[in-house]
From Swiss-Prot:
Family: Belongs to the COX15/CtaA family. Type 2 subfamily.
Name of this chain's protein: Heme A synthase
Gene that this polypeptide is encoded by: ctaA
Protein EC: 1.17.99.9
Subunit structure comment from the entry: Interacts with CtaB.
Pathway membership, UniProt: Porphyrin-containing compound metabolism; heme A biosynthesis; heme A from heme O: step 1/1
Binding residue positions for heme: H274, H335
Localisation: Cell membrane
PANTHER family the record matches: CYTOCHROME C OXIDASE ASSEMBLY PROTEIN COX15 (PTHR23289), CYTOCHROME C OXIDASE ASSEMBLY PROTEIN COX15 HOMOLOG (PTHR23289:SF2)
Membrane-crossing segments per the record: 25-45, 111-131, 139-159, 174-194, 210-230, 276-296, 305-325, 327-347
Main localisation: membrane
An example Gene Ontology molecular-function term: metal ion binding
InterPro entries: COX15/CtaA_fam, HemeA_Synthase_type2
GO biological process: heme A biosynthetic process
Lineage of source species: Bacteria, Pseudomonadati, Pseudomonadota, Alphaproteobacteria, Hyphomicrobiales
Amino acid sequence: MAVANPTTEQAILSEMRKQNRDRRALRFWLGFVLLALFCLVLVGGATRLTNSGLSITEWKPIHGVIPPLSAAEWEEEFRLYQRIPEFQQLNSSMTVDEFKGIFWWEWAHRLIARAIGVIFALPLIYFWLTGRIEKRLRWPLVGILALGGLQGGIGWWMVSSGLSVRTDVSQYRLATHLVMACLIFAGCMWIMRGLSRHSDDPPPTRSSRGFAAAIAIFSLFQIYLGALVAGLDAGFSYNTWPLMDGAVIPSDLLIQQPFWINAFENPKTVQFIHRIGAYTLFALTLINMVIALRAAPWTTHARRAILLFVLVTLQAAIGIATLLMQVPLHWGLLHQAGALVVFGFAVANWRGFYGEYPHGTMIAERD
């Protein structure tokens, strides 16, 4: 019978303790990034809800950090805004002081985005150079950083759609911008969750992991639909619930031709589809909870299923309240925040079925 080498065991334990310390540091960093991303999405939502997104008409990645500091600079910034259709057709009576109100939202949104790039890139470089990032995570983290750079380009692509002909941004580009933000958020959540300890409870059923994936993906699709609602101001189309214009299925959902374009450009149809998406997500999380409670009651997986259902139910209630009150700013932002919370938890729940990343020493022993 082989006798374990005490020196080898001590070396393994020492390496595992170091990895655990490194993982705690990475979790703290990624958690801070997630919080910053959450704030960025909320400020972006406020920018949209206050119609502030076209107030800055130029893309200045570096010196755009500095806002106008003098009356002359404010006049110049306002003059640039006066050139676009939004001002000419909708805000022609706006004063410089009123312009400042919409300018600060867009400026804050861009500033936070730049700041996130810094708080992601600099620690990534530091952790990489000091050997604190496990090899399996290096390129996924670089990929997230690259997506962040791409997201900046998508943001300007979105803004540019409202600078020449339209008086607002394209709902398609707005949805792309929000979905990309959610994908970056999901990537950080996925890695952070993998660096955390997991329960040893077995999945309730063999299909639990796939069902969790379906819920997370559908949550993202529902956010995409919500972005179309925001882009088309579709939240103002029907402000009643549960009926729409006194009917379960309104009569004017397919008035545009070709008929399929209604799903993307008819505000009433877009709101209808978003409602159906909410009912579907509610049903999916309810079924998931019932299955988990029946197959594996009081396990970690069952508790997560309960919490996910509760979050979706609260989000649905917030959505209904927002609709009935005709989308006041604070309720609209609460609804957007709830969407990101639901999606983030759905991703964490999905990742929970894969377990913690194995330690390097465990891999070496297995090999």
